Amino acid sequence: MSEKSPPRTILQMLGAVGEAQVQQAVRLAAQSLAQLGAAWVLEVSHMGYLFGLFDALGVPENARPGLLEKLREKNAHELRRAAQAAGLDAAGAAALTGLLELSGSCEETLAKAESACRNDRMRAAAAELRALAKTLEASGGAVRLDLSLAGEMEYYNGLVFQGYLQGLPRPLLKGGRYDLLMQKFTPGAGAIGFAVYLDELDRLSAPTPPVQRNSTDRVMLNVALPKGRLGDRMYDLLARIGYGCTEDYNATRKLVVENPAAGIRYFLVKPSDVAIYVEHGAADVGIVGKDILTEASADVYELLDTGLGRCRMCVAAPADYKDDPSRPVRVATKFVNIAKSYYASIGRDIDIIKLNGSIELAPILGLSDVIVDIVETGTTLRENGLRVVTEFMPISARFIANKASYQFKHNEMDAMLEALRKTLQEETK
C-alpha cells in the first residue's frame, strides 16, 4: 500500500512563467503565512546560484546530489569532506562551505552573494533574488535569504522557498520553480507554485506544556542532553561558557533543569531519543552521536561536529573470514539502516539479523558472517577473536538543531555555537 500524501493546499502557475508570475507566487506565499500566524519566516534561495557555483568549480554531475544533501543539513564538516572526495581542492571546498554563511537578512546576504558570483548563471540568480527582495520589503514578517536551502536538483531549477510559523516544528509551506518537471509534459512551459501542509496547522491549537512556558521575556533555548557521560561532558562545557544552571546538574534527579537568566533549559533524555525530541520540536537543539543520527535519518540541521566521543562504524568478522560472493552476506547489527546503506553503496546483497546487544557473539555462534557495530579501541573484538574488515563511518557527538527553531532562534543558537567552538578548539590545542 502506498503512503498517503499529507493533506495540503496547492497553488500553481503553469505555462508562460516570467518574472511577474514568480514574484506574484512568492508574494502569495508570504501573504498566506501572514494570514496563518503572527510570527512567520519565509526562507528563500535559488537553485541557479548553486548550480552556477557547481559549474564554476567543475563539480562532477554525479557528486552534486550528495553535496546538495549536505548543504540542506547545514553540515559544514561533512560538506567539506564530500567536496574533497568529489575532486575539489581546498579553495573549492571552502567556496562550497561558504554558502552556509550566505544566510540572513535580504540586503546583507545579497551583498555577500553578489560579491561571490563567479559566472553569469550566479549573477542572473542574484539579480532575480534582488528584484524579489524589493517586492517583499513591505510583507510584514521576516523574509530571509539562505543559499544553503536546496531543492531536489531534478525537480527545481530556480527560486525555492519554505515558510515557517512560530510554534510548528517543521516547514508549513514549501515551493519553488520547477520548469524541468513541467517540460517533461509540455516542452517550453514553465511552472512555479507552493503547497501549504494543512496537518501542521492542527499543532497550533495544542497548548504549550507548562515546563516550556517562559517565566521571563528572554528567549529560552531548549537543549536535549543525552543521559550519561556524553551529556555530563557537554553540560560541563556549556556551563563554562555561561549556560549553567543554579541547581547542581550532577546531583539532581529532575529531567528538566533551567536557568531563565541564561536563557537555557535542559531536557535529560535517553541518547537514542535526542534526535527525535529535536526533529519534532520538543527541543530546539541537542547533542547526539552520529551513529544514532544516521540510523534515525532525522530531519534536522547538523551544525557542529564536537569531536567528542570519537569512534567508528565498522564491519568486523572472525579472523579467518573470507567473503563468498555467490551468496548474500549475513550481517548482525543493531544499526539496520546504516548496514543496509553501506552494503547498498558497494552493491552487495545481505541478509540482516537485528540484534540489540552482544553483537560480537553472532559470528562466534554462526548466526552471522559479519557484524556492523561501533568500534572504539577494538579490545572487545580482539578478545572475541574478531577483526575489523572495513571502517566506513567516523562517529562523534554532533550538535543538531530543529529546522523551524533555527528560523526563530538562530541568533541564540549561533551565539552558543560560536562560544562552544572556541572552547572545543582551546581544549584540542
What is each residue range found by the language model?
Residues 216-429:
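Domain-level signature for soluble enzymes in the chorismate/prephenate branch of the shikimate pathway
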Residues 50-141, 376, 385-387, 409-428:
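Long, charged alpha-helical interface segments
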Residues 1-38, 82-216:
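Positively charged, Gly/Ser-enriched RNA/tRNA-binding surfaces
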Residues 6-10, 39-41, 158-160, 191-193, ...:
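Broad gene-expression machinery/nucleic-acid interaction feature
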Residues 14, 28-39, 56-60, 70, ...:
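Mid-sequence acidic-hydrophobic segments that form the walls
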Residues 11-20, 39-41, 66-70, 116-123, ...:
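Flexible, glycine/proline-enriched loop segments at strand-loop-helix junctions
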Residues 42, 145-147, 268, 352:
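A structural preference for short, hydrophobic beta-strand core positions in alpha/beta folds
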Residues 5-9, 45-52:
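Short, conserved phosphate-binding/catalytic loop or strand-edge motifs used
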